Amino acid sequence: EMTSSLVGSEMCIRDRSYTCQWDMTNAGNWTVLTNGDKLWTMEISSPNALSINLLYDKFWLPEGTSLFLYSKDKKQYMGGFTSINNKGDSINLKGFATGIIQGSNVILEYYQPAHISQTAIISICNVVHGYKPIVAPAILTRSFGGSGNCQVNINCPEGEDWQKEKRAIALIVVNGFRYATGALLNTTANDKRPIFLTADHCLGGWGNYNIKYDAVTNPNLNHYMFYWNYESPSCSRGGSEPQILSTSGATILANNE
């Protein structure tokens, strides 16, 4: 089940992940505004990167606060993230992921009104440095537009009757790699619960992904990103990757190998 909330629009380009341990106590700068509100900012630079996205091992925002990410030229931003995006609470902390910011710098900006006493917990554990168009592990070597001749794009004439259904399809991105796909399912209650169906092999356990997730022992997919509307704009292959919307995080309800 997807635990995600809308996090913004961006393009799919990145590939190499670097481990770090930055949080609001050992990185960034705090500023107290004249009205008592607080602002925490942090700039991350990854020289020569085409894009950057961040993974968090701990993420929690108090109600009433907000977090934005934006590029250094301020042409692209993401957020605001709020308490709605929390996967856990301030005690039972869980991870998080944010999508791609184009360029070699990303700026985080956290805003906390003066009347809020609790401070957010934002701990960054990985910086994904994009150095080439999105490429998956060895088993998934094709990039955007590299599908075979047998592939029929959704915007070909054959897809005319599936234009509503295509909105349920998402590309799964894990640690900067284009990883798998899946689709949203409805329930008999028609309650819009975000149930997402994908293949069991998309839960890891092979190649570079030796961590295997399952519904019983390891169900939290907090670092999984879901990219919507990832499609060719026409029937032909190739072209530029689309502007897309992304959501993050899910919990495995059931799986079967």
Where are these regions (language model features)?
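Extended extracellular/luminal ectodomain segments enriched in beta-structured repeat modules
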Residues: 46-53
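Glycine-centered tight beta-turn/hairpin loop motif at sheet-sheet or coil-to-beta transitions
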Residues: 49, 74, 175-177
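Short beta-strands within extracellular/lumenal beta-sheet-rich domains
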Residues: 34-45
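Serine endopeptidase catalytic core focused on the charge-relay Asp
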Residues: 100-257
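Extracellular beta-rich ligand/substrate-recognition surface
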Residues: 26-36, 174-175
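Short, surface-exposed beta-strand/strand-loop-strand elements in extracellular ectodomains
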Residues: 61-76
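Single conserved hydrophobic/aromatic residue that forms the stacking wall/gate
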Residues: 2-8, 12-13
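Beta-sandwich interaction modules
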Residues: 43-44, 75-105, 111-116
